[in-house]
């Protein structure tokens, strides 16, 4: 088990781990209310990466990581994750729907 200190390093190594073996990689979130800590874990049973935080601002980062993993799982491990963003892109796409006149 390796606790990664930097968020960017955790995301990069997690994506590499998933791309190495997509069928065996798991992603787990665990929140301990009594300690106020959130632990994110990515493992493929050979290597285990963990990131621990107690900052509320990291929730947005966690949402972006979820979107990255969803893209990797649905579109395949070869997808370009630089085009994956958070909630903003989804809201922009929904805002475009329904504009204009019905015919």
UniProtKB/Swiss-Prot annotation:
Chief location of this protein? cytoplasm
Positions of disulphide bridges: none
Q: Quote the cellular component terms of the Gene Ontology held in the record.
A: signal recognition particle, endoplasmic reticulum targeting
Any idea which GO molecular function terms this record carries? 7S RNA binding
InterPro entries the UniProt entry points to: Signal_recog_particle_SRP9/14, SRP9, SRP9-like, SRP9_dom
Q: What is any one GO biological process for this UniProt entry?
A: negative regulation of translational elongation
Q: According to the UniProt record, where is the region Disordered?
A: 81-103
Localization, per the record, is:
Cytoplasm
In the UniProt record, does the keyword Cytoplasm occur? yes
What keyword terms does UniProt attach to this protein? Cytoplasm, Ribonucleoprotein, RNA-binding, Signal recognition particle
Transmembrane parts of this sequence: none
Question: According to its UniProt record, which protein family does this protein belong to?
Answer: Belongs to the SRP9 family.
Question: Which proteins does it associate with, and in what oligomeric form?
Answer: Heterodimer with SRP14; binds RNA as heterodimer. Component of a signal recognition particle complex that consists of a 7SL RNA molecule and six protein subunits: SRP72, SRP68, SRP54, SRP19, SRP14 and SRP9.
* Known function: Component of the signal recognition particle (SRP) complex, a ribonucleoprotein complex that mediates the cotranslational targeting of secretory and membrane proteins to the endoplasmic reticulum (ER). SRP9 together with SRP14 and the Alu portion of the SRP RNA, constitutes the elongation arrest domain of SRP. The complex of SRP9 and SRP14 is required for SRP RNA binding.
What is this protein's record name? Signal recognition particle 9 kDa protein
């Amino acid at each position: 088990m390796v606790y990664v200190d930097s968020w960017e390093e955790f995301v990069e190594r997690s994506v590499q781990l998933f791309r190495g073996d997509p069928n065996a990689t798991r992603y787990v979130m665990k929140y301990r209310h009594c300690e106020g800590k959130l632990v994110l874990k990515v493992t493929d049973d050979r290597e285990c990466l963990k990131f621990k935080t107690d900052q509320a601002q990291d929730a947005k980062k966690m949402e972006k990581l979820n979107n990255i993993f969803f893209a990797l799982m649905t579109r395949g491990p070869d997808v370009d994750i630089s085009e994956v963003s958070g909630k903003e892109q989804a809201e922009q796409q929904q805002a475009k729907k329904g504009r204009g006149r019905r015919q």
